Amino acid sequence: MRLVETIVSGMAGRYATALFELAEEAGSTDAVAADLDRLKGLIAESADLERLVKSPVFTAEEQVKAVGAVLAAAGITGIAANFVKLVAQNRRLFALPSMFDAFAALVAAKRGQTVAKVTVAEPLNDAHQAALKEALAQQTGKDVSLDVTVDPSILGGLIVKLGSRMVDASLKTKLNSIRHAMKEVR
């Protein structure tokens, strides 16, 4: 069993694996990763682009045309651009965020790193990020990079997902636990 098969799975994993292998052959893994990160940021910033990615209403031709224009405007070319256009042509844009995550996991594994998905109520400052990275690195024995998402609905604390493990130290979860405990007392 190849290392790639143990890191990613499903449709998004297959697409990400194909992209990773192409990028490896071309020696442009870092450039492709940077292009995908830029596109991921554009999708997060634009409600219209997010709607294009997630909505099944648009035809494949409309998606390819729109994505092509976005890629050209963002200066994303080569392997990454061709990959995203192929995904649009195959009507799989809805899975693009999962493909980004799977590709990032493959790149991190190649570098001997692991990616921790961290959800926080407010942005972490540099000192907190460094402390969290250090604590996770001690637990895993690997270099850890953080994928931080801000979600005010967790109220406080944080949620850390690292591989198949998850630690939920959010205030929302603690309050829900207290609420359930109080219901049982009645």
From Swiss-Prot:
Keyword Repeat appears in the UniProt entry: no
Membrane disposition: Peripheral membrane protein
GO molecular function: proton-transporting ATP synthase activity, rotational mechanism
Gene Ontology cellular-component annotations: plasma membrane; proton-transporting ATP synthase complex
InterPro entries named among the record's database cross-references: ATP_synth_OSCP/delta_N_sf, ATPase_OSCP/d_CS, ATPase_OSCP/dsu
Keyword Cell membrane recorded: yes
Compartments reported by the entry: Cell inner membrane
Keywords, in A-Z order: ATP synthesis, Cell inner membrane, Cell membrane, CF(1), Hydrogen ion transport, Ion transport, Membrane, Transport
Lineage top rank: taxon: Bacteria
Pfam families, sorted: OSCP
Family: Belongs to the ATPase delta chain family.
NCBIfam families: ATP_synt_delta (TIGR01145), PRK05758.2-2 (NF004402), PRK05758.3-2 (NF004406)
Complex and partners: F-type ATPases have 2 components, F(1) - the catalytic core - and F(0) - the membrane proton channel. F(1) has five subunits: alpha(3), beta(3), gamma(1), delta(1), epsilon(1). F(0) has three main subunits: a(1), b(2) and c(10-14). The alpha and beta chains form an alternating ring which encloses part of the gamma chain. F(1) is attached to F(0) by a central stalk formed by the gamma and epsilon chains, while a peripheral stalk is formed by the delta and b chains.
Protein task: F(1)F(0) ATP synthase produces ATP from ADP in the presence of a proton or sodium gradient. F-type ATPases consist of two structural domains, F(1) containing the extramembraneous catalytic core and F(0) containing the membrane proton channel, linked together by a central stalk and a peripheral stalk. During catalysis, ATP synthesis in the catalytic domain of F(1) is coupled via a rotary mechanism of the central stalk subunits to proton translocation.
HAMAP family: ATP_synth_delta_bact (MF_01416)
Protein name, entry field: ATP synthase subunit delta
Source species of the chain: Azorhizobium caulinodans (strain ATCC 43989 / DSM 5975 / JCM 20966 / LMG 6465 / NBRC 14845 / NCIMB 13405 / ORS 571)
Record gene name: atpH
